[in-house]
């Protein structure tokens, strides 16, 4: 039975690995996307006796899925409301139910509501200022951005982008759409002093070539685990035939 459980756990682990790789490849063109990586651990070891020696492994299981938060390459767009963070930081935006979530995607646009213009993400989330308020744009504003994240129109500052980071970014939880939310593990907001560049976006940090190489490796491992199950099934069939 041991080979059955080892093969079964191996297939599940490699499927989880391939799912993560597929997500990375499909999002390689997504602005600000951060590559996801899987880590695995051995399951419990067993011993055939109490004598000292190496135990017999029982398989592998998913240990964690973490993000590579290294910066992607800057892409020059020349678009006024495209912003790129150069360094460690996240834009704060308003998610569903008014909850604050965080993103590296600075592809912003204007939302016209009740006679006012608001700065929003491409998904429609309100971009927040340093006070946690929605950013309203002046009528007919020609927006300029300072390195410190201050938004100006006609030479006057009307808002400043809220830019934050975290003690443990790996502790952030994915909130969908390239956004993240705080957890106890990530810790609370810490003001970021990263530079923000206007007319520029951050590309994903996915290395597609490396991801395809990992996919091939995972597929081979998946196949080997499948052969383990086939071998176990054949041995079980032969054992049953001997009993009859």
PLM region descriptions:
Residues 1-244:
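Amphipathic alpha-helical polymerization modules
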């Amino acid at each position: 039975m041991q080979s059955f459980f080892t093969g079964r756990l191996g297939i599940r682990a490699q499927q989880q690995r391939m799912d993560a790789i597929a997500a990375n490849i499909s999002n390689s063109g997504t602005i600000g996307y951060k590559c996801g990586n899987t880590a695995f651990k051995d399951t419990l070891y067993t011993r055939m006796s109490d004598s000292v020696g190496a135990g017999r492994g029982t398989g592998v299981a998913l240990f964690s899925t973490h993000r590579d938060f290294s910066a992607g390459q800057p892409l020059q767009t020349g678009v006024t409301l495209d912003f790129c963070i150069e360094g460690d930081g996240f834009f704060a935006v308003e998610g569903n139910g008014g909850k604050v979530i965080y993103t590296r995607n600075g592809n912003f646009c204007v939302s016209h509501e009740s006679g006012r213009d608001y700065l929003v993400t491409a998904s429609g989330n309100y971009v927040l200022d340093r006070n946690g308020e929605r950013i309203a744009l002046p009528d007919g504003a020609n927006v300029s951005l300072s390195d410190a994240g201050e938004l100006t129109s006609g030479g006057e500052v009307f808002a400043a982008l809220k830019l934050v980071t975290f003690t443990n970014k790996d502790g952030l939880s994915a909130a969908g759409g390239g956004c993240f939310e705080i957890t106890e593990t990530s810790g609370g907001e810490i003001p970021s002093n990263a530079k923000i560049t206007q007319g520029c976006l951050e590309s994903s940090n996915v290395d597609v070539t490396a991801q395809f190489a990992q996919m091939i490796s995972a597929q081979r491992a998946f196949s080997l685990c499948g052969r383990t199950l086939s071998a176990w099934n054949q041995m079980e069939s032969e054992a049953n035939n001997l009993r009859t």
